[in-house]
From Swiss-Prot:
Protein name per Swiss-Prot or TrEMBL: Berberine bridge enzyme-like C-1
Cofactor: FAD
Annotated GO biological process: alkaloid biosynthetic process; nicotine biosynthetic process; response to jasmonic acid
Protein induction: By jasmonic acid (MeJA).
Gene: BBLC
Subcellular location: Vacuole
Residues recorded with modification Pros-8alpha-FAD histidine: 105
Length: 562
C-alpha cells in the first residue's frame, strides 16, 4: 500500500513578512486568497457582525475573553479538507500566524490568543466533526473538530459493548485532547486516548494531506501525546475501539469532614487505587465547599474538606462493592452507593451534565452538545506522584486547598495498563512508576475577574508548597493541563520565523523550551524536537509552549524512565 500524500491544487508564491505593507492590506490579501480558493466561512475583525460570537463560542476559559486580550484578525471555519488546506496556505501566503482550535479548552488559551505581538488567525475546526464507526474492524474515524462527547455518542449508537478510552469532558475537542495523550476513566484498563490511535490524516505547513505511512513513524509517534498545535492540523484520527461489558458500575461517594478525618482516607486511597485490578478506577477530588462558619464548625465534627471518591468498575455492582469493601473498608461502601448502567451512561454520569440539563440529564444525546452555556475563568497546574504521600504531605495539600473554597484538587490513579505501556511507545511519557497524577484547579466567575491575580497566586503558592512530595528532576507535568508558569517561547519565535537567522537561534530555542518540554515529555523531548524539525522546520505551527525545530544537534538528557 502506497502512502497517502494528497496535494490540493493551489497556485501561489509564499511571501515574506515584509511583503505585506500593512494590516489592512494583509487582511484584504487574506480575504481575497480565501475567497479565490472557495473558502467563504470566515469572519474578520472588527467588521463582521458575528465575529465576537464566533470568537467566544468555543473559548472555554474566560480569562482569555477579556477586552485587553489579543484578538485574531480572522476566524476561519473550513467545511472540508480542501478548504482546510487552502486556509493553511492562504495564511502562509499572507504571513499570518495560525492558531488551531478544536474545542477551545486550552488551559492557557493557546488555541484562541497569541501573545508574541504578531497578527494571527484562528482556524476553528468545529465544522469538521464527523465520526464514522466500523464495527467490523473495531475502529472509527473521527475528524479533528469532533468533541470527545460526539465520539462517545457515535460509538454508543453503533454498539453497546464498544468504547473509547479518553477523558470525561464531553465538549473537549479530540484534536487537542488526543494530541496531548488523553487520560480518562478507562486509562487504567486501555491506556490514554493516544494509545488507541492507529492512523491519522495530518495536513502539514505545505498543504500535504499525510497518512501514517506518508508522515513517517517519527511524526506519527509525535502526534500521539506530543501536544497540540505543533505538527500541522489533524484532519482526522483513526482510533481503535475497546471492548467493555454491557453493564458497568459507577459511584460518587462524598466524605465531608475535618482535615484530620479526611487525611487518613486520602492516605489509604493512594495505597489502594493504583493497585486495584485494571477493571477498576477509583479517583478522588476535593470539591468546592463554601459553608457559613456556623454550619462548618457548628457540628461535633467540623466540615472543612469534602473529598468525593469517583469509581468506575467494568463489571456488576456486587463485585464492585465487594472489591472496595475488602480493599478500602474505610469508605464503607453500601450497595445503594453504586449504580449499574451502560458504558455510555457512565460517560454521561461522569460528565456532570446533570448540573446543566437537570431532569433531562439522562439523555445521552446531550453528549453531542458543543456549547453548554456555562463558562468560567480558570487556571490549572499538574503534578505526578511516585512515592506515597506522608501524612505531612497530605495535610499540606488539605490546608492549602481549604484556603480557596471554590477550587478543585483532583487525584487520578495510575497503575494497571499505564504501568504496562512503555514510556517511549508514544510521545506521552508518564507511565510506570507513577502512583497518581494531581490537577490543581482554581476557578472564578468572569465578574470576579478583578480577583484573578489572587486565584492565580493561590494556585502558584499551592504548587510550590507541594514540591517536596511530588516527582522531581524533572518535576513532571501533563501537557493537556498547559501551564505557562513553566516557561514560554517568545523572542526566539521571531528569529525562527526568519530563515536567515534560524540557523543561529534554533539551538537556543530548543534549550529554552527544554525547561518545560522535559516536564511534559521527559526523555521524549529530544525525539519530539527531531520530529518537529522533520515535519515543520520553519515553525509554522507554534504557540507559547510549542516544540521548536532545530537544524543543529542537541545534547541528550537522560532521566530515569517512567
Amino acid at each position: 500500500m502506497f502512502p497517502l500524500i494528497i496535494l490540493i491544487s493551489f497556485s501561489f508564491t509564499f511571501l515574506s513578512a515584509s511583503a505585506t505593507s500593512g494590516a489592512g492590506e494583509g487582511v484584504a490579501n487574506l480575504s481575497t486568497c480565501l475567497i479565490n480558493h472557495n473558502v467563504h466561512n470566515f469572519s474578520m475583525y472588527p467588521t463582521s457582525r458575528n465575529y465576537f460570537n464566533l470568537l467566544d463560542f468555543s473559548l472555554q476559559n474566560l480569562r482569555f475573553a477579556a477586552s485587553n486580550m489579543p484578538k485574531p484578525t480572522v476566524i476561519i471555519l473550513p467545511n472540508s479538507k480542501e478548504e482546510l488546506v487552502s486556509t493553511i496556505l492562504c495564511c502562509r501566503q499572507t504571513s499570518y500566524e495560525i492558531r488551531v482550535r478544536c474545542g477551545g479548552h486550552s488551559y492557557e488559551g493557546t488555541s484562541s490568543v497569541s501573545f508574541d505581538g504578531s497578527p494571527f488567525v484562528i482556524i476553528d475546526l468545529m465544522k469538521l466533526d464527523d465520526v464514522s464507526v466500523d464495527l467490523d474492524s473495531e475502529t472509527a474515524w473521527a475528524q479533528g473538530g469532533a468533541t470527545i462527547g460526539q465520539i462517545y455518542y457515535a460509538i454508543a449508537k453503533a454498539s453497546d459493548v464498544h468504547a473509547f478510552s479518553a477523558g470525561s469532558g464531553p465538549t473537549v475537542g479530540s484534536g487537542g485532547h488526543i494530541s496531548g495523550g488523553g487520560f480518562g476513566l478507562l486509562s487504567r484498563k486501555f491506556g490514554v486516548a493516544a494509545d488507541s490511535v492507529v492512523d491519522a490524516l495530518l495536513i502539514d505547513a505545505d498543504g500535504r494531506l499525510l497518512d501514517r505511512k506518508a508522515m513517517g513513524e517519527d511524526v506519527f509517534w509525535a502526534i500521539r501525546g506530543g501536544g497540540g498545535g505543533n505538527w500541522g492540523i489533524i484532519y482526522a484520527w483513526k482510533i481503535r475501539l475497546v471492548k467493555v461489558p454491557k453493564i458497568v458500575t459507577t459511584f460518587k461517594i462524598s466524605k465531608p469532614g475535618s482535615k484530620q478525618y479526611v487525611a487518613p482516607l486520602l492516605y489509604k486511597w493512594q495505597i489502594v487505587a493504583p493497585n486495584l485490578a485494571d477493571d477498576f478506577t477509583l479517583g478522588v477530588q476535593m470539591i468546592p465547599i463554601d459553608l457559613p462558619a456556623d454550619m462548618k464548625y457548628g457540628n461535633p465534627t467540623p466540615i472543612e474538606i469534602c473529598p468525593q471518591f469517583n469509581g468506575l468498575y467494568l463489571g456488576p455492582k456486587t463485585e464492585a462493592v465487594s472489591i472496595l469493601n475488602e480493599a478500602f473498608p474505610e469508605l464503607n461502601v453500601k450497595n445503594d452507593d453504586a449504580k449499574e448502567m451502560t458504558w455510555i451512561e457512565s460517560a454521561l454520569f461522569f460528565s456532570d451534565l446533570d448540573n446543566i440539563f437537570g431532569n433531562s440529564s439522562d439523555d445521552i444525546s446531550h453528549l453531542k452538545e458543543r456549547y453548554l452555556g456555562v463558562k468560567i475563568c480558570f487556571k490549572g497546574k499538574s503534578d505526578y506522584v511516585k512515592t506515597p504521600f506522608s501524612m505531612d504531605g497530605i495535610m499540606t495539600a488539605l490546608v492549602e486547598h481549604e484556603k480557596n473554597p471554590n477550587a478543585f484538587l483532583v487525584f487520578d490513579p495510575y497503575g494497571g495498563a499505564m504501568d504496562k505501556i512503555s514510556a517511549q511507545a508514544i510521545a506521552f511519557p508518564h507511565r510506570k512508576g507513577n502512583l497518581f497524577a494531581i490537577q490543581y484547579y482554581a476557578q472564578w466567575n468572569e465578574e470576579d475577574d478583578a480577583k484573578s491575580n489572587e486565584h492565580i497566586e493561590w494556585i502558584r503558592g499551592f504548587y510550590n508548597k507541594m514540591a517536596p512530595f511530588v516527582s522531581s528532576s524533572p518535576r513532571g507535568a501533563y501537557v493537556n493541563y498547559l501551564d505557562m508558569d513553566l516557561g514560554m517561547n517568545m523572542d526566539d519565535d521571531y528569529l525562527l520565523r526568519n530563515a536567515s537567522s534560524r540557523y543561529s537561534s534554533s539551538v537556543d530555542a530548543v534549550e529554552r523550551a527544554r525547561a518545560w518540554g522535559e516536564k511534559y515529555f521527559l526523555n521524549n523531548y529530544d525525539r519530539l524536537v527531531k520530529a518537529k524539525t522533520k515535519i515543520d522546520p520553519l515553525n509554522v505551527f507554534r504557540h507559547e509552549q510549542s516544540i521548536p525545530p532545530t537544524l543543529g544537534s542537541t545534547q541528550e538528557h537522560n532521566y530515569s524512565s517512567e
